[in-house]
Swiss-Prot record:
Residues 556-567 have a biased composition (Basic residues). Residues 159-169 have a biased composition (Polar residues). GO terms for molecular function: ATP binding; protein kinase activity. PANTHER family: INACTIVE PROTEIN KINASE SELMODRAFT_444075, OS01G0750732 PROTEIN. Residues 255-487 form the Protein kinase domain. This is Inactive protein kinase SELMODRAFT_444075. The keyword ATP-binding applies. The lineage of its organism: Eukaryota, Viridiplantae, Streptophyta, Embryophyta, Tracheophyta. Residues 180-189 have a biased composition (Basic and acidic residues). Residues 148-206, 511-567 are annotated as: Disordered.
């Protein structure tokens, strides 16, 4: 179907398209077919990487390997295209990469290509093994290269490169050396500084956003799961694999005590290793006898939808006889719990199994069982769960990081077992020093603690309408303002009692109506009066805290906005 659509599109441009399907193709058939078709471009799928080496050896055409919509150019040969395909080139193609290109031929965006060297010594000696990777390289760039090549005045590319034929084969062409020298001096200064052990000051402002920006510019290949084992994360988009009980029994050593990890609300968790070497966590379901196959498989389907780089991913399952097991990827570096509360605590987070509705749709009535300390109040009361429930859970995690306490700790005294209930009075009474983990001994960044406590204050609000969105929480953690309208008399401070910083938290940019503007003005007036009354009160021994002021502004602003919307 795709090739048929391409044929119809190119017919308008007088481009003849021929499609041929070869069955039981042997190794090396691609170079021979390319010679038969006299192809100038050979585009290979990622599953045909092995054929790429043969094409480099036997062909002189342009060769590209496409992996996840990102092409890797093995050879870009724009030289002497008018010659017959089987005619020998005057320059040995094995000693020149990008043969036929000079600096004047390369378009403006071409210098964004990344040069990668092969890790193996055998391939490193062959220049053809070096790949030019273009993360978002489009055919328009290649077309521009072709046009510039035909229109370019001056010596031909072959004349430019002929001066390099007398040099030893081990040396790169002069054009390539000049190109690399320009890139090294212009774009790779950071790498040079790193090699010289030059330390640079760390800018903590918007550090999270910078990391996301760097992640987008990095290689499309998923990063290692952790810095210890360097295991890659499972490929996203794959359906969960169905294991047999014998396979999981073999992987866990017969569910031996040596591989025991934790005892959860739904069953025991064991560490295992699959035949391909991947470490997994296998969870046995205690309530397996009460579930049918269809119900269990429906729950597995729901869990498999949770595929994100920072989430533990479901790899597979087992539904054999009355046995029900789930197979997750194993995080050998441990979870947040293990680093905060000790290595012996459970290392696999489990929020229970969600269930489909009878009509097969997933809605707010879906039950998510477990992890009581992280569940939002509206869920525990009504059973309804929305995206603001995730915001509440994230606020609890922030409090865990600041206080070093568990979300629920039954070993503590009454009133201190639930982290949110224990922290709210300190947040309300501005006793923030009571919230900070004493084990830190003052070794923390005050601004970061400010941002975390402010975000946690808003996230754990009992009213879900008042809680910010996760995008707003991200900006809070970075120390940014959350709206275009922000009034601050001085820098805010949670711990040093600095003057109040007034900040409207809301997305004013999305709605410029007069009703929202008037509600914003009313918020400013209302919490200016609140600030004055709080400071003049006889019971107030310190100025109104910025976190409380900002939280109050957010609450009033949201309520006023909701009221205007309903009107």
């Amino acid at each position: 179907m795709v090739m048929e659509k391409l044929r119809k599109i190119h017919d308008l441009k007088k481009v003849h398209t021929t499609l041929e399907i070869l069955q039981f193709a042997r190794r090396g058939v691609i170079p021979s077919e390319a010679k038969r078709f006299r192809a100038t471009w050979v585009v290979l799928d990622r599953n045909l990487k092995s054929e790429g080496k043969l094409c480099l050896q036997e062909l002189n055409s342009n060769i590209v390997v496409v992996h996840r919509s990102n092409p890797k150019i093995l050879r870009l040969n724009l030289k002497r295209r008018d010659l017959p395909y089987d005619e020998e080139e005057s320059i040995d193609s094995s000693s020149v990469l990008l043969n036929g290109l000079s600096l004047s031929v390369m378009p403006k965006g071409f210098d964004q290509l990344y040069w990668e060297s092969s890790t193996s010594s055998s391939e490193a000696s062959s220049p053809d093994s070096r790949l030019v990777t273009a993360p978002k390289f489009e055919l328009s760039v290649l077309e521009e290269l072709l046009k510039n090549e035909t229109r370019r005045k001056g010596p031909s590319p072959s004349e430019v490169l002929n001066s390099t034929t007398s040099s030893p084969a081990s040396h790169k062409p002069q054009v390539l050396n000049d190109f690399l020298r320009m890139k090294e001096s212009r774009e790779y200064t950071e790498e040079t500084d790193t090699q010289r052990n030059v330390s640079r000051p760390v800018d903590r402002v918007s550090s999270v956003r910078k990391q996301i920006h760097l992640r987008k510019q990095s290689s499309p290949q998923p990063p290692p799961l952790c810095s210890i084992c360097q295991h890659k994360t499972p490929v996203f988009g794959k359906p969960p694999r169905k294991f047999t009980f014998a396979e999981l029994q073999l992987a866990t050593g017969g569910f031996s005590d040596v591989n025991f990890l934790a005892e959860g609300g739904y069953g025991s968790v064991y560490r295992g290793r699959l035949p391909d070497g991947q470490a997994v966590a296998v969870k046995q379901h205690k309530l397996a006898s009460t579930q049918g196959d269809k119900e269990f498989c429906a729950e597995v389907e729901v869990l498999s939808c949770a595929q994100q780089r920072n989430l533990v991913m479901l790899i597979g399952y087992c539904a054999e006889d009355k046995k029900r097991l789930l197979v997750y990827e194993f995080v050998c570096n441990g979870s947040l719990d293990s680093h905060l509360y000790g290595r012996r605590s459970k290392t696999v987070g489990d929020f229970g199994l969600a269930r489909w509705q009878p009509n097969g749709e997933l809605g707010v009535e879906t039950r998510v069982i477990g992890a009581f300390g992280y569940l939002a109040p509206e869920y525990t009361q009504t059973g309804q769960i929305t995206e603001k429930a995730d915001v509440y859970s994230f606020g609890i995690v922030l409090l865990e990081l600041v206080s070093g306490r568990k979300a629920v700790d039954l070993s503590r005294n009454k009133g201190e077992m639930c982290l949110s209930e224990w922290a709210r009075p300190f947040l309300r009474e501005q006793k923030y020093e009571k919230l900070i983990d004493q084990r830190l001994r003052g070794r923390f960044c005050v601004n970061e603690v400010e941002n975390m406590l402010l975000a946690a204050t808003l996230c754990i609000d009992p009213d879900p309408l008042i809680r910010p969105r996760m995008s707003q929480v991200l900006r809070l953690l970075e120390g940014d303002s959350l709206s275009d309208t922000s009034l601050s008399s001085s820098s805010s401070g949670l711990l040093n009692g600095s003057p109040v910083s007034i900040l409207l938290i809301g997305d004013l940019s999305q709605d410029s109506s007069s009703s929202r503007s008037s509600s914003a003005s009313s918020v400013l007036k209302s919490f200016s009066r609140t600030q004055h009354s709080s400071r003049s009160s006889s019971n107030a021994g310190s100025p109104l805290n910025p976190a409380a002021t900002q939280a109050l502004a957010f609450k009033k602003y949201n309520k006023n906005t909701t009221r205007h919307t309903q009107d």
